[in-house]
């Protein structure tokens, strides 16, 4: 095993903002991305997205709803791509799991990985927030590992009573 991926830092204020968004979206999944200075390794801005899973405008499996999946709108995907050429690029894509579990599901892994299997679909890490009826249970951060050729968990965060 060689190099571990570098952890992009998320401070407590950013986590609190995302956790509140997860609560406001519950029982649906929330989604968006976190931006930071191109030269740094810390996110400072939350860019919330509308979960377009139920919009009927995306070619995903129809039995999935916004309670079990998320998808960015076309406009959000364009904005995400534009961010990579800016001074404040997206560094982490986040979404919530209303089942209370903070893990990168098989579907999450497929969506986050390049369709050619040669790395991540976007040059970002992933953050998954586990939320249930009563609280934010926890969240977990994942990064692409060149050594393992897949996303690996690199950090866990405590939940919150919201």
Model-derived regions, located:
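Conserved beta-strand-loop surface patch within small alpha/beta domains used
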Residues: 1-90, 99-162
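Single, functionally critical "micro-switch" positions that shape active/binding sites
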Residues: 96
């Amino acid at each position: 095993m060689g190099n571990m991926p570098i952890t992009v830092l998320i401070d407590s204020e950013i986590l609190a903002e995302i956790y509140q968004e997860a609560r406001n979206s519950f029982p649906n999944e929330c989604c968006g991305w976190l931006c930071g200075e191109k030269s740094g390794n810390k996110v400072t801005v939350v860019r919330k997205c509308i979960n377009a899973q139920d919009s009927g405008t995306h070619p995903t499996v129809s039995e999935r709803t916004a309670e079990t999946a998320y998808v960015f709108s076309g406009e959000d995907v364009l904005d995400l791509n534009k961010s990579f050429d800016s001074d404040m690029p997206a560094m982490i894509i986040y979404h919530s799991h209303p089942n209370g579990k903070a893990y990168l599901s098989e579907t999450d892994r497929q969506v986050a990985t390049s369709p050619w299997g040669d790395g991540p679909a976007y040059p970002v890490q992933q953050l998954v927030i586990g939320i249930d009826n009563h609280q934010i249970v926890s969240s977990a951060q994942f990064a692409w590992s060149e050594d393992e050729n897949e996303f690996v968990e690199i950090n866990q965060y405590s939940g919150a009573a919201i």
